[in-house]
Structures are given as structure tokens and as C-alpha cells.
């Protein structure tokens, strides 16, 4: 095989690899279609995934350490026996949120030039919607804030359009959580900025 044919085959394989990488990487990580932009975007995406894995592994370790050590003998726990624990969620001042909310559901929002954060009660969970420009590493920051506040992430969806990103969370309210919805949105907003003036509305 001639040198020209070898080079042509190498370029073809490289283009196929780049095409595969681009299809596996969210579009907002790749600003242009050239090789450097694709590889750079993939590296950023992998770094953020690695950070997310570290957060989840840390969460798993904490759950393991907090697991009761006494044996259960494979007994079945009836839902009725958990009623007090599952229904009395100490989500403080929820009554005030319910009476002042302008949403059709119980909700609050907190906006800044950097992000719009909205939280709503949905059954025993909270639906959190965050719209912002793309910031590398921001997803990990939000998840860290939620875990610090005793929320458990049940579902996460990410969508984007050019430089704008929408993070959609469904989170479970932890028994140790004592925040109102307004305080939750404010804490998430703080993960974006530290010195900006943040306006909270409900």
C-alpha cells in the first residue's frame, strides 16, 4: 500500500473517531467542528463526568457508613409502619410558601443575571429547574449543594441550546432538611455567584 493510501486511510479513521466522539458529547461542549474543538470539548466533558463520579462515590460511601449494623432477618417492613417517618418531612415553613406562592403548584424562584432557579413541590419530592449559560463544572456544584442540604437526586435531565443549559432535577427531601423552597433556590443560586445581588421571588 502506497504512502498516499496509508495517509488517506488514517485520515478516514480519524474522521470516523471524531464523528463518534462528537455524537457522544453534549453539543454545548463543542463550539466548532474542527478537530481541536472536538477533542477539547470531549476532555472538558470527561473531566466533569469524573467529578460527578467522585460525588456519587462519596455519597455511596456515606450511605454505607450510615447503614444500621443490626440484622433484619429478612423481615418485611409494612408501609404503614413507616408512615410517621415518610409523611412528617420537616420541610420548614412550607405552609407560608403554600399561601404566598404565585405558581399553580407550591413553588418559589430565585433569579440573577447568571441563572434562573425554580423549585416546586411535587408530591413528596421537589422539582428543581435551573437555566443558565454553560459553565464547566457547574453541574457538580449544584449536586454538591443539594447533597449538603440533605436532598437526594432521584432524576436528572440536561438539555441545551447553543450556550444555554437547562438542568432538570427531581430530588427527595431528606429527613434532616429544614429549608423553605425560597432558601433552597437561593442556595442553588449561590453556587453560581458569591458577590452578586440575588433577588428571590415567590
From Swiss-Prot:
It is found in: Nucleus. GO terms for cellular component: nucleus. Residues 1-49 form the bHLH domain. InterPro entries: bHLH_dom (IPR011598), FAMA/SPEECHLESS/MUTE-like (IPR044283), HLH_DNA-bd_sf (IPR036638). Keywords: Developmental protein, DNA-binding, Nucleus, Transcription, Transcription regulation. Its main location: nucleus. It comes from the Eukaryota. The keyword Transcription regulation applies. Induction: By UV, flagellin, and jasmonic acid (JA) treatments. GO terms for biological process: epidermal cell differentiation; guard cell differentiation; stomatal complex development. GO terms for molecular function: DNA-binding transcription factor activity; protein dimerization activity; transcription cis-regulatory region binding. Leaf epidermis and flowers. Homodimer. Transcription factor. Together with FMA and SPCH, regulates the stomata formation. Required for the differentiation of stomatal guard cells, by promoting successive asymmetric cell divisions and the formation of guard mother cells. Promotes the conversion of the leaf epidermis into stomata. This is Transcription factor MUTE. The gene is MUTE.
